[in-house]
Amino acid sequence: MARTFAQFRGVTKAIVGIGRWAAAQSTVYDAATERERRALHRQGVSAEVSGVFVTPDGDTPPTALNDRMIGVSAAQLRAIDEVVAVPYETVKAPAVRAALRSRLVGSLVTHTSLARALLETDTRTGPGTADVG
C-alpha cells in the first residue's frame, strides 16, 4: 500500500466524482454511519470530492472519518496538475460549487441542466453571478 500512495506524487491528471453530502448522492455518505454523518453535518460538510470533505465555502476540514479512510488527501489532490470532475444531477449544484471553491477541481464535464444550474444561481452572491470563489 505504501508504494501505491507514493505514486500520488507523480499523478498529473485525475478524473473525480463529486458527491452531495446526502443519502444516495455520495457513496461515502451512504457508507458512513449515522453518527459519522451527523458529525460531518455539524462540521458544515456539504460535499465530498473523492472522499475529501468540503464545506459550502470550499474549506476542507479535517474529520475523524478522514483518519479511517484510505485515499487521496486534499493536499495531494490540489497538487495534481489537472483534476477533472464529472458530476451528474442538478441537485448536486451546491456540491459542485463547493468543490470548485475548494480548488480541488479545475475542470468540469457535465450535462446542460447542471451547467445551467451552476450559472443561474449562486447562493453567496445571488442570481446570475456564478461566482465560484
Residue ranges and their predicted role:
Residues M1-G133:
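Conserved phosphate- and dinucleotide-binding cores of soluble alpha/beta proteins
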